[in-house]
Structure formats: structure tokens, C-alpha cells
């Protein structure tokens, strides 16, 4: 039964999602305790590092499909990173900052998440490709 992809794939996604959601939760708590809740530092950090990880994984695994099994690709890209990164929270946080009339913080958060996210994807791709070359793949 566990040999069937129709069973293995959802299990892989689920296991990754548990780890991603818990990572997001505990990082958000840590940032709130460390820096307060007046600015969504945790969500910003999670979005940027999630983009970096997705770019790295894309370059290392998805461009070199034979390197990593489909279950591991699903576990990381769909499960872990899907649960870890949350641009819906990004939108809500921006909306909340705007509602609080904190226009400078809202503008920085909105633009910073987008610009730094795209830059982080590119850096992740470069790092993934360099790491792949170092592994001889």
C-alpha cells in the first residue's frame, strides 16, 4: 500500500506541512517576544527566508530532477515551504498597518517583502546551483 504514489505523495506533503507550520509558528512567537508586535518582523523574516529556500530548492532539486525523489520534492516544496511561507498573512499584516494609519511601516513592509522576496529567490537559485556544482551533479 505504501508503495503507491497516491499514498506516499499526500503523506510526504503532510509531514512537510507539519514541520513548516510549526517552524512558522515558533519563529513568529520568537520574533514577537524579541521585537514586539508593532511590526510583523516574524512574517517578514519567514517570507524572505521562505523565498530564499524555495529558490535554493528549485535550483538544486527541480532543475536536477533525478537528484531528489518526488516524495522529497513534495515534502519540501509543497509541504514544508507551502506551510512555512504565508503571503496571505503578509496581505493581512499590510492591511492592519494601513488600518492603524502606519503608512510608512505599511509601505516598507509591502515593498520590502516583495522586493527582498524576489532578490532572495535569485540568491537561493544561485546558491543552489553552486551547491549542485560542488556535489558534482
UniProtKB/Swiss-Prot annotation:
<keyword id="KW-0472">Membrane</keyword>
<comment type="function">
    <text>Fluoride-specific ion channel. Important for reducing fluoride concentration in the cell, thus reducing its toxicity.</text>
</comment>
<keyword id="KW-0813">Transport</keyword>
<protein>
    <recommendedName>
        <fullName>Fluoride-specific ion channel FluC</fullName>
    </recommendedName>
</protein>
<comment type="similarity">
    <text>Belongs to the fluoride channel Fluc/FEX (TC 1.A.43) family.</text>
</comment>
<feature type="transmembrane region" description="Helical">
    <location>
        <begin position="11"/>
        <end position="31"/>
    </location>
</feature>
<keyword id="KW-0407">Ion channel</keyword>
<keyword id="KW-0997">Cell inner membrane</keyword>
<keyword id="KW-1003">Cell membrane</keyword>
<keyword id="KW-0812">Transmembrane</keyword>
<dbReference type="GO" id="GO:0005886">
    <property type="term" value="C:plasma membrane"/>
</dbReference>
<dbReference type="InterPro" id="IPR003691">
    <property type="entry name" value="FluC"/>
</dbReference>
<dbReference type="GO" id="GO:0046872">
    <property type="term" value="F:metal ion binding"/>
</dbReference>
<keyword id="KW-0915">Sodium</keyword>
<keyword id="KW-1133">Transmembrane helix</keyword>
<dbReference type="GO" id="GO:0140114">
    <property type="term" value="P:cellular detoxification of fluoride"/>
</dbReference>
<keyword id="KW-0479">Metal-binding</keyword>
<feature type="transmembrane region" description="Helical">
    <location>
        <begin position="75"/>
        <end position="95"/>
    </location>
</feature>
<feature type="binding site">
    <location>
        <position position="82"/>
    </location>
    <ligand>
        <name>Na(+)</name>
    </ligand>
</feature>
<feature type="binding site">
    <location>
        <position position="85"/>
    </location>
    <ligand>
        <name>Na(+)</name>
    </ligand>
</feature>
<feature type="transmembrane region" description="Helical">
    <location>
        <begin position="107"/>
        <end position="127"/>
    </location>
</feature>
<dbReference type="GO" id="GO:0062054">
    <property type="term" value="F:fluoride channel activity"/>
</dbReference>
<dbReference type="Pfam" id="PF02537">
    <property type="entry name" value="CRCB"/>
</dbReference>
<feature type="transmembrane region" description="Helical">
    <location>
        <begin position="42"/>
        <end position="62"/>
    </location>
</feature>
<keyword id="KW-0406">Ion transport</keyword>
